[in-house]
Amino acid sequence: MSADLARIAEEVSHRRTFAIISHPDAGKTTLTEKLLLFSGAIQMAGTVKGKKGGKFATSDWMEIEKQRGISVASSVMQFDYRDHTVNLLDTPGHQDFSEDTYRVLTAVDSALMVIDAAKGVEEQTIKLLNVCRLRNTPIVTFMNKCDREVRDSLELLDEVENVLKIRCAPITWPIGMGKTFRGVYSLLSDAVILFEAGTEKLVSDIEVIQGIDNPRLDELFPLEMEQLRMEIELVKGASNEWSLEEFLAGELTPVFFGSAINNFGVREILNALIDWAPAPQERDATVRNVDPKEAKFSGFVFKIQANMDPKHRDRIAFLRVCSGQFERGMKMKHLRLNRDIAASSVVTFMSHDREIVEEAFAGDIIGIPNHGNIQIGDSFSEGEDLAFTGIPFFAPELFRSVRIKNPLKLKQLQKGLQQLGEEGAVQVFKPHSGGDLILGAVGVLQFEVVASRLAAEYGVDAIFESASIWSARWFSCDDRKKLDEFVKTLQMNIATDAGGNLAYLAPNRVNLQLTQERWPDIVFHETREHAVKLND
């Protein structure tokens, strides 16, 4: 193995790239900050220390996330912990819920699921986990807020297994809850980690007592220990044993209990992500699978963020490095346009703060300045024609028809929507029967962002109105004659999206079911690949 390949393999083995997913208010933002605190990226709560020694307040990026048009961003943070480079991708809350959230999950190798132990599994968690399941992404689970009155722990595990359809292996177990929360018992190390409230508590302050039968524990809290021993006996008999193999296959989730606001349980999660979560894996491309330890650079764009810096009205394409070594100034081939670009101003992130990248390896997320030529799903390489797959469009859940007040601006509207559709800001459907263009989204905020960007970037004042569409499905058929017949017969429901793919716009659930039954040769798709055009 050459020195370069040996170094690439070494760097890749020390990369961990994961997303944090949760329902809003489960404590995700707090946990994100605490992970940064434990890693040393934050020197004190509220102040993030950049790699060059510069500081900025974490409240800066939290405030930015609240602003419209910027809150659609998913924060990307890179930090070092235990000789590993960790790439953490945060996902936005439900007001900002968009396809952007889904696509972030295509760029990671594992996910950390945060659940409010008082509420259990909630709607957005279900949606996000379903997306993780598309790629069998390994999931680590953190039951948060154990210092409050929470639900029964066994009940929570049961709910995760039944609702999310993933088996649980408890790694730590809570001792008491709310005002009587005493800490957690580690099933793997047979140790009790004592809890003491306080947002400034660090690892050095946390006391660990070895052995569940240690007499000191009975002296400290006899009632809770009696209850704990009964529960642990039950848990060992009723729950799944920890298996790294099943975790990596996405079939089993290790479960940790704690309180992020009190820094409790955070160290255990970070260690689990380093010890158990996978390093960057092979990625599927149209021509072959790509090994992260290959010599040549490759990667794909999973997100485009406009106006990250409101002062510069810029656009950044977020690229997940899939193989090789990226070096500043290198030439990269933009495969869709068959064009080379010189990568000199590529950046890395600490949330919205950035610095120029000198080098990057598989698993790293880098930002390429984009002047409108880069689309979501675009692949880059050192020359080889390989387009990465697994970057999906999702069937929209909300629809609006769009028209303009000034008919003279029609061309600008069409151009704007075409570009925004390609960028992935919204899905654009052109009905075959004529009439207004239809926009599709999975979150209301997407429409608001599109309206403001049409006005700011294209000078178009657009009117959005509700459309009588329940859902959209892309469709395909191996038999061209049957495909043409379907399109001709149901012309009133057929549209073409920004990528030139055919879609069926269903007015209601019954209509879609009946259509599927009547046309058994037509295959309906809830997702479609960026890199693959249907019916070609």
Curated annotation (Swiss-Prot):
Molecular function as annotated in GO: GTP binding; GTPase activity; translation release factor activity, codon nonspecific; translation release factor activity, codon specific
Entry-linked InterPro entries: EF-G-like_DII, EFG_III/V, G_TR_CS, P-loop_NTPase, PrfC, RF3_C, RF3_dom_3_sf, RF3_GTP-bd
All copies of domain tr-type G, residue ranges: 13-281
TM spans (from-to): none
GO biological process terms held by the UniProt record: regulation of translational termination
GO cellular component, one term: cytosol
UniProt KW keywords: Cytoplasm, GTP-binding, Nucleotide-binding, Protein biosynthesis
Major subcellular site: cytoplasm
SUPFAM superfamilies assigned to the protein according to its UniProt record, in alphabetical order: EF-G C-terminal domain-like, P-loop containing nucleoside triphosphate hydrolases, Translation proteins
Subcellular location: Cytoplasm
Positions contributing to GTP binding: 22-29, 90-94, 144-147
Entry similarity comment: Belongs to the TRAFAC class translation factor GTPase superfamily. Classic translation factor GTPase family. PrfC subfamily.
NCBIfam families found in the cross-reference section: prfC, PRK00741.1, small_GTP
Function: Increases the formation of ribosomal termination complexes and stimulates activities of RF-1 and RF-2. It binds guanine nucleotides and has strong preference for UGA stop codons. It may interact directly with the ribosome. The stimulation of RF-1 and RF-2 is significantly reduced by GTP and GDP, but not by GMP.
Name of the protein in question: Peptide chain release factor 3
